[in-house]
Amino acid sequence: MSGTLLAFDFGTKSIGVAIGQRITGTARPLTAIKAQDGTPDWTLIERLLKEWQPEAVIVGLPLNMDGTEQPLTARARKFANKIHGRFGAVVKLHDERLSTVEARAGLFEHGGFRALNKGSVDSASAVIILESFFEQGF
């Protein structure tokens, strides 16, 4: 196993992307992928999978604060299922509650308002999702 994991923060306009290593438990952002109503350019997803050859793909699961599902939850599940179906990748869903809030705070701290563009926030959220996945011992 490579120990490399790829994470996505699903969104209807932008999908954040991060790459991480299980051995170090760390992740870094990659360029976010634009989406049209939640549909990405699948050739970009395929390119990422071929380039990084992750042992698994982690997709953030958007839940309400009380743990219940919201409308975007089903769409994130569908996105995860499509990655598995199209590419045969091992896909795991991971709770992403507060990842965007944490990402915005971290980016603002380091770069002010200029750092808060949509793609940066989404990919920083993907980093938080992946590092949280590592912290929970997966």
Curated annotation (Swiss-Prot):
CDD domains: YqgF. Its EC number is 3.1.-.-. SUPFAM superfamilies: Ribonuclease H-like. It is an enzyme of class 3 (hydrolase). GO terms for cellular component: cytosol. It is found in: Cytoplasm. InterPro entries: RNaseH-like_sf, YqgF, YqgF/RNaseH-like_dom, YqgF/RNaseH-like_dom_sf. GO terms for molecular function: nuclease activity. It comes from the Bacteria. GO terms for biological process: rRNA 5'-end processing. Keywords: Cytoplasm, Hydrolase, Nuclease, Ribosome biogenesis. NCBIfam families: RNAse_H_YqgF. Could be a nuclease involved in processing of the 5'-end of pre-16S rRNA. Belongs to the YqgF nuclease family. This is Putative pre-16S rRNA nuclease.
